[in-house]
């Protein structure tokens, strides 16, 4: 079983740093699962082959990551509130 490494774009790391501990822990759990199975069809972002989302419904947060098979790395592209699709809009610019 291949385990991917986890990386962050600089902007995403800043966003990650602003999350409260509880939200961060929830994302950590989900990210740990995705590192062994990053390509979840239901979580794929439309119009993007390698980008996927993680939703935290209770906290109202979204995380967008990109799978880079050649480097075996999952890169967090954006983290943000669900309102106005903030995370998705940020991700498209990165």
Residue ranges, per PLM feature:
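A short, surface-exposed loop/turn module that caps and links secondary-structure elements
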Residues: 29-57
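Short, mixed-charge, low-aromatic patches
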Residues: 19-23, 44-47
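Enriched for short, Lys/Arg-rich terminal
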Residues: 1-7, 11-14, 18, 25, ...
């Amino acid at each position: 079983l291949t385990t991917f490494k986890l990386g962050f774009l600089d902007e995403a790391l800043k966003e990650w740093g602003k999350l409260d501990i509880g939200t961060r822990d929830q994302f950590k759990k989900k990210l740990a699962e995705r590192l062994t199975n990053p390509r979840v069809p239901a979580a794929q972002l439309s119009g993007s082959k390698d980008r996927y989302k993680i939703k935290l419904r209770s906290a109202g947060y979204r995380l967008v990551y990109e799978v880079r098979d050649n480097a075996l790395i999952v890169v967090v592209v954006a983290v943000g509130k669900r309102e106005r699709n903030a995370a998705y809009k940020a991700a498209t610019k990165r």
